[in-house]
UniProtKB/Swiss-Prot annotation:
Lineage, highest ranks first: Eukaryota, Viridiplantae, Streptophyta, Embryophyta, Tracheophyta
Pfam families: Ribosomal_S14
Compartments reported by the entry: Plastid, Chloroplast
Protein name: Small ribosomal subunit protein uS14c
GO cellular component term, pick one: small ribosomal subunit
UniProtKB keywords: Chloroplast, Plastid, Ribonucleoprotein, Ribosomal protein, RNA-binding, rRNA-binding
Subunit (UniProt): Part of the 30S ribosomal subunit.
Taxonomy, superkingdom: Eukaryota
Length: 100
């Protein structure tokens, strides 16, 4: 189980990312369209003034139940440990064991 403060920190980052998403996208689009170097620098300065945690690259996908940051399956939002436990208990509909 991950520390609660880490999970809260990740939630805070998600909120910041959602808040600044349109601003960051529009700024990046402007940078691509503008040809003047001085204007690009000005837009880049504006982009850098946004909070560091608002960047989408700082987000980490975590397990929904345990908060584990690694080995998390996107389709389920669960880590491999919990996924296997749920699979063995028959809680995942449509999941079957492979045999070849």
């Amino acid at each position: 189980m991950a520390k609660k403060c880490w999970i809260q920190r990740e939630k805070k980052r998600q909120k910041l990312e959602q808040k600044y998403r349109l601003i960051r996208r529009s700024s990046k689009k402007e940078i691509r369209e503008v040809t003047s170097l001085s204007e690009k620098w000005e837009i880049q300065r504006k982009l850098q003034s946004s909070p560091r945690n608002s960047a989408p690259t700082r987000l980490r996908r975590r397990c929904f139940s345990t908060g584990r940051p690694r080995a998390t399956y996107r389709d389920f939002g669960l880590s491999r440990h919990i996924l296997l436990k749920m699979f063995r208990a028959g809680l995942l509909p449509g999941a079957t064991r492979s045999s070849w």
